[in-house]
Amino acid sequence: MKLWMESHLIVPETRPSPRMMSNQTLVTEFILQGFSEHPEYRVFLFSCFLFLYSGALTGNVLITLAITFNPGLHAPMYFFLLNLATMDIICTSSIMPKALASLVSEESSISYGGCMAQLYFLTWAASSELLLLTVMAYDRYAAICHPLHYSSMMSKVFCSGLATAVWLLCAVNTAIHTGLMLRLDFCGPNVIIHFFCEVPPLLLLSCSSTYVNGVMIVLADAFYGIVNFLMTIASYGFIVSSILKVKTAWGRQKAFSTCSSHLTVVCMYYTAVFYAYISPVSGYSAGKSKLAGLLYTVLSPTLNPLIYTLRNKEVKAALRKLFPFFRN
């Protein structure tokens, strides 16, 4: 889940009285502003989004198939990579079909139910990615810092339990946030200043009290953002310390190469999120929010397969074995 650091935007405001609300019509659909302020770039944006979405689906599906059907890739690192690829597919597929359709038809409305569904699946996949990146950092820590005990530390049962816990924990957390969103009333306006439905802009449109939602957002920020980030930093602190103790340059390079791909993905993901969502109130920008949304929902799922496979001989060998056209 992306860090909901825009919770600082949810400021106290005067809510309509029940009598006033009785004379208002509740919103049944929302308008996604998207990139409508730049209609001259519509064809260009559609082409770019279609290319990136196709690349994200193709890359992640190939990784999923390669790991699933190759027994040599059933190690913990690849098991977690399989889960990450699945999350990437869900994350980008929850928003890109609607975004592409809006660019083609210029029809940017989304039903209330569709918005809530999009919110649920996007938040579920994105929050699961944050937790999984932390789990993958621990896996690299175990492999580099405790190589002799790696097989016992990262047993099949333990890895399966971690992956299941990530999916279930994020599903429950997302259900809570979505449930709290469903209890709110939306009386208008109904324009979401983004190209997909997300929590903070929706809260700003609500004509109900959003206090409980705000509290839950702060708690989610603390866990998904701060705690996970610190745990990842701690894991890499131990990893770097262990690598520096290796006497030969070749040994240090080999040790670092086993975690360089994951470190690249972690830096890319957190940079995109922190860029837009950790900032003072006066520094908030809808443009920054849209850019960050593109980075972690479109660009990241597209680049992840490339980052994890370009320097991974095992994955490339599995792809060549599974798909003959890769041999050339």
Swiss-Prot record:
InterPro entries, alphabetized: GPCR_Rhodpsn (IPR000276), GPCR_Rhodpsn_7TM (IPR017452), Olfact_rcpt (IPR000725), Olfactory_GPCR (IPR050516)
GO MF term set: G protein-coupled receptor activity; odorant binding; olfactory receptor activity
Residue ranges of the TM segments: 44-64, 73-93, 118-138, 158-178, 216-235, 256-276, 290-310
Ranges in the topological domain labelled Extracellular: 1-43, 94-117, 179-215, 277-289
Principal cellular location given in the protein's record: membrane
Glycosylation sites: N23
Database matches in PROSITE patterns: G_PROTEIN_RECEP_F1_1, G_PROTEIN_RECEP_F1_2
Cytoplasmic side: 65-72, 139-157, 236-255, 311-328
Domain of life, source organism: Eukaryota
Intracellular or extracellular location(s): Cell membrane
Paired cysteines (S-S): C115-C207
A Gene Ontology cellular-component term: plasma membrane
The entry's keywords: Cell membrane, Disulfide bond, G-protein coupled receptor, Glycoprotein, Membrane, Olfaction, Receptor, Sensory transduction, Transducer, Transmembrane, Transmembrane helix
Record's bilayer topology term: Multi-pass membrane protein
Family recorded in the similarity comment: Belongs to the G-protein coupled receptor 1 family.
Its biological purpose: Odorant receptor.
Protein name according to UniProt: Olfactory receptor 13A1
Record organism: Homo sapiens (Human)
